C-alpha cells in the first residue's frame, strides 16, 4: 500500500495527515493500484464502459492515459480481452502518457522504445497508434489549472504537472519519431506554454501536417485562439466545462468577465481550427449528443445562456464528434463519415440533430449502432 514515506517523497500534491493525494501526488498512488487489473474486476468495469458506448452511439474511443496506473502491458491486454469478447464491437485507440514513464524513471528514448514494443500487441480493434500524451497543468474541476494574469481572484494558484525541461525532452523525442502529440492543457497560462512548445518544435523540425492537439481547452484568450490557428494546431475540447463549471468560475475564481467565456469554441470554429469534442468520461457524460448540445447552446447549470459569441454551429459540433474527431486521431481515412471504402461504423438516431429544437438536442434517442456493417439495436 501507500506509505507516509511515499507521500513525503512527493514535493506537491500529497498530504498524509489528510489522506489527500491529488495531481502530482497521484504518482505515489497509481503504481500501487495494480489490483485494478485483476481480470474479473477489470473485465466487469470494461463491460460496463462498452455498454455505455453502445447506448450513446459511440463506435470508437480514444484512451489518452494508457499506462497511468503503472502497468501498461497488463492494461493493454485487459482492454484487448474486453473488446474481443464484446458482442457489438468497438474500436479503441490507446495513447501512452508522459507521466507513466516519468513515474517509472524512464528516459524519453526508453519511453519511445517501450511504446514500439507495445505496438506489437496491436489488433484490428485495439491499437497503440503513433500518438503521445503530454501533461501541462492541473485539473479544471479542482481549480488547479494554470491561469494567466490576473490569475485566480481568490489568490490561489494552479499547478504545473511536468516541468519545462522534461516536457520539451519527451515532446521532442516523439515529435522527431513521427508521433502526433496531444497535450493536457486547461488554463490560459497552460495554453501559452503549449503554444511556446509548438513554436519550438516547428522551428527545430518543421512539419506541415503535425496535428498537435490541445486537449481539454477550459480557458484561452482570443489572441491565443488566433495563434493556435496560425500554428496549425488542433483542439480536442470538453464543452461540458462551460455547462457545469462556468457559473462557479464566474465567482471568485475567474470573475464575471472570464468565467462565462470558458471553452471558446465559436472563436476556434470561425478561424478554421480543427475541433473534436470529448467527454473525458466521467468528467462529462459519455454522450456525443450531450457534448453537441453544450457546445451549441452554451447554457450553464442555472439555465442561463452565457458567452453566446462562443457557440459552435450545429454542423460544426456534429463534425466535432464524427469526421473532425476522426481527423484529430489520424483516422479520417477509415472512420468518421459514411463513404465508400471506409469502415461502416455509425450511430442510428431517432431524430436529425441538425433540425430539432436546441433544447431537444441532448434528448435524441440513440436507436442503435452499425459497427463494421452489422446493425445492433439498443
Residue ranges and their predicted role:
Residues 1, 100, 106-109, 119-124, ...:
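Carboxylate/His-rich catalytic cores and anion/metal-binding grooves
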Residues 1-94, 123-175:
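Catalytic pocket of metal/acid-base enzymes, prominently hydrolases
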Residues 44, 172-182, 189-212, 216-217, ...:
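His/Asp/Glu-enriched, well-ordered alpha-helical/loop segment
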Residues 57, 62-71, 96-100, 185-189, ...:
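Conserved short loop/turn motifs at secondary-structure junctions
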Residues 61-63, 90-97, 127-136, 181-183, ...:
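Hydrophobic faces of well-ordered beta-strands that scaffold small-molecule active sites
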Residues 66-69, 99-101, 140, 241-243, ...:
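Solvent-exposed loop/turn segments at secondary-structure junctions
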Residues 75-77, 106-113, 191-204:
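Distinct, well-ordered alpha-helical segments
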Residues 82-87, 117-127, 205-207, 228-232:
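Acidic (Asp/Glu)-rich catalytic clusters
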Amino acid at each position: 500500500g501507500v506509505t507516509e514515506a511515499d507521500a513525503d517523497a512527493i514535493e506537491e500534491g500529497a498530504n498524509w495527515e489528510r489522506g489527500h493525494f491529488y495531481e502530482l501526488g497521484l504518482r505515489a498512488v497509481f503504481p500501487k493500484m495494480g489490483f485494478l487489473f485483476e481480470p474479473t474486476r477489470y473485465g466487469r468495469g470494461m463491460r460496463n464502459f462498452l455498454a455505455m458506448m453502445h447506448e450513446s452511439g459511440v463506435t470508437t474511443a480514444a484512451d489518452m492515459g494508457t499506462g497511468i496506473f503503472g502497468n501498461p502491458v497488463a492494461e493493454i491486454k485487459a482492454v484487448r480481452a474486453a473488446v474481443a469478447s464484446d458482442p457489438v464491437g468497438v474500436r479503441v485507440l490507446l495513447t501512452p502518457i508522459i507521466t507513466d514513464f516519468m513515474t517509472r524513471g524512464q528516459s524519453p528514448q526508453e519511453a519511445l522504445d517501450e511504446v514500439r514494443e507495445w505496438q506489437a500487441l496491436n489488433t484490428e480493434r485495439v491499437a497503440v497508434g503513433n500518438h503521445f500524451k503530454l501533461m501541462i497543468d492541473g485539473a479544471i474541476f479542482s481549480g488547479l489549472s494554470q491561469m494567466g494574469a490576473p490569475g485566480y481572484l481568490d489568490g490561489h494558484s494552479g499547478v504545473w504537472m511536468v516541468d519545462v525541461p522534461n516536457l520539451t525532452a519527451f515532446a521532442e523525442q516523439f515529435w522527431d519519431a513521427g508521433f502526433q502529440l496531444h497535450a493536457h492543457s486547461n488554463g490560459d497560462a497552460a495554453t501559452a506554454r503549449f503554444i511556446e512548445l509548438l513554436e519550438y518544435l516547428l522551428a527545430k523540425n518543421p512539419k506541415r501536417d503535425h496535428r498537435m492537439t490541445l486537449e481539454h481547452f477550459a480557458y484561452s484568450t482570443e489572441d491565443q485562439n488566433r495563434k493556435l490557428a496560425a500554428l496549425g494546431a488542433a483542439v480536442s475540447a470538453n464543452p461540458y466545462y462551460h455547462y457545469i463549471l462556468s457559473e462557479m468560475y464566474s465567482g471568485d475564481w475567474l470573475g464575471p468577465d472570464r468565467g462565462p467565456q470558458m471553452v471558446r469554441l465559436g472563436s476556434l470554429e470561425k478561424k478554421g481550427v480543427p475541433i473534436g469534442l470529448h467527454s473525458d468520461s466521467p468528467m462529462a457524460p459519455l454522450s456525443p449528443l450531450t457534448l453537441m448540445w453544450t457546445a451549441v447552446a452554451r447554457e450553464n447549470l442555472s439555465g442561463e445562456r452565457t458567452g453566446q459569441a462562443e457557440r459552435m454551429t450545429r454542423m460544426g459540433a456534429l463534425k466535432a464528434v464524427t469526421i473532425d474527431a476522426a481527423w484529430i486521431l489520424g483516422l479520417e481515412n477509415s472512420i468518421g463519415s459514411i463513404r465508400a471504402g471506409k469502415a461502416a461504423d455509425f450511430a442510428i438516431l431517432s431524430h436529425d440533430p441538425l433540425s430539432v429544437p436546441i433544447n431537444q438536442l441532448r434528448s435524441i434517442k440513440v436507436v442503435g449502432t452499425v459497427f463494421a456493417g452489422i446493425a445492433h439495436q439498443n
